Amino acid sequence: MHRYKKEASNLIKLATPVLIASVAQTGMGFVDTVMAGGVSATDMAAVSVAASIWLPSILFGIGLLMALVPVVAQLNGAGKREQVPFEIQQGAVMALLISIPIIGVLFQTQWILGYMNVDAVMATKTIGYIHAVMFAVPAFLLFQTLRSLTDGLSLTKPAMVIGFIGLLLNIPLNWMFVYGKLGAPALGGVGCGVATAIVYWIMFLLLLFYVTTSHRLRQVQLFTTFHPPQLNAQVKLFKLGFPVAAALFFEVTLFAVVALLVAPLGSTVVAAHQVAINFSSLVFMLPMSIGAATSIRVGHMLGEKSTEGARIASHVGILVGLSTAVFTALLTVILREQIALLYTDNRVVITLAMQLLIFTAIYQCTDAIQVIAAGALRGYKDMRAIFNRTFIAYWLLGLPTGYVLGLTDWIVEPMGAQGFWIGFIVGLSSAAAMLGVRLHWLHRQNDEIQLNYEAR
């Protein structure tokens, strides 16, 4: 029991800065939504649709680079910090390379919106937002590379501080470019994209300054020796990161595709859907931060060749995450009207958003289990298991269920947005079950097999 309490303390110390950093980053989306909503419902809806295209694209790149966290954590646990600079420099190369196709995908926004029959005015604003924010792609991915370094070394506070600075900068920059203050043009929802691009470049430069000047990273000597790009290293990183990226892509696109499918239902439905999605993303930061901390702790324990420590870290992560999820689910149900009022004063939007917030409360517990179990499996570098199971859960179970219930009369009369949210519940709950079973299976293997996964 003492080891569990000690592990819980270590986990919370790691997870708290990750949580604050993640909330700050997601809070930027909240600020975008609220400020765009202050212009018009169409601007608010445009930001929602733009996020549905931007997030899956950029998060695929982030997923590739997330593989660096357990790599760094295991090297740190094994006392091999001298190997860390090579891995991070190769990660920076990967970040720049993957920026090219991501920007290429973002350039296809007009085609995507045309295919989805989105309203012309909303489409114009959405395209403007995407064209502005695509300039942030390299900065966003390079920031993630450096964050993989600090997080992997169990230094989660730097990203927290910089994330909070980014949020504080995003508010006045949005104010300037959305409403046309201090001589800036009044761009409406497009101004949110301009502000976001500026903020991400500032955040990258701040983290770069930290890792090159902090006395806590002197032993790492990140840029003392230049390591040229190596094809084998790039292939290895890609193979390790691709399943994580694909799994993250599957989950995010489950929400993003639904937002695009909901778009033709009108601005009111889109706005209510965006309220529920944005708040759900804020709440999701709790279990996601615990999952990230669990990944770090599992990786560190495996670096020390302690499979028992890795098992305890996994169990503690799930217990802590499930406890917080029960609490947030209850608060969501009780305060759903007040939550909706934070986003808009449109009563029609509020009424529909309150209904959708009930669905967010329902799946919070299973969502916590799936994201923390995935974090533990990342610590083991059991990436393929995450890939396979999330694909089945999100694309073969969740999305088809949502589509059938939301837009067809095959089972019941078309339920609209509510049907898609039932699909979310099915997908996330299925992922929780499958990933939880996989983690339990891994824990039952002997030490040699578990450490063999670690060595992959």
From Swiss-Prot:
Annotated Gene Ontology cellular components are: plasma membrane
The main place the protein resides is membrane
What phylogenetic lineage does the species belong to? Answer: Bacteria, Pseudomonadati, Pseudomonadota, Gammaproteobacteria, Vibrionales
Q: Which organism is it from?
A: Vibrio vulnificus (strain CMCP6)
- Tell me what this protein is called: Multidrug resistance protein NorM
Localization of this protein: Cell inner membrane
> The organism sits in which domain of life?
Bacteria
Q: Which UniProt keywords apply?
A: Antiport, Cell inner membrane, Cell membrane, Ion transport, Membrane, Sodium, Sodium transport, Transmembrane, Transmembrane helix, Transport
- Is Transmembrane included in the keywords of this UniProt record? yes
According to its UniProt entry, the protein's GO biological process terms are:
sodium ion transport
The family classification in the record reads: Belongs to the multi antimicrobial extrusion (MATE) (TC 2.A.66.1) family.
